[in-house]
Curated annotation (Swiss-Prot):
One Pfam assignment: Exonuc_VII_S
NCBIfam families registered for this protein in UniProt: PRK00977.1-2 (NF002138), xseB (TIGR01280)
GO cellular component, one term: exodeoxyribonuclease VII complex
Name the record gives this protein: Exodeoxyribonuclease 7 small subunit
Length: 71
């Protein structure tokens, strides 16, 4: 069974995809596939960040501290 990559590993993978696409030297079909993969990674990374924020909010609230979250 494959282990899930860390946030940092997934972020690096997204950065690699972006660099590859920005180079403009990728065939169209590959560029489309890489773009789709990048979008999935981006959404996954965003979800991870949102979950981390929720966890921190819970920890802070459990501590009795007041917090203010801006959306």
């Amino acid at each position: 069974m494959a282990t899930k990559k860390t946030f940092e590993e997934r972020l690096q993978e997204l950065e690699t995809i972006v660099s590859k696409l920005e180079s403009g030297e990728v065939p169209l079909e590959e560029a489309i596939a890489e773009f789709q993969k990048g979008m999935i990674l981006s959404k996954d990374l965003q979800k991870t960040l949102q979950n981390a924020e929720k966890t921190l909010v819970k920890v802070m609230q459990a501590d009795g501290s007041e917090i203010e979250i801006e959306d």
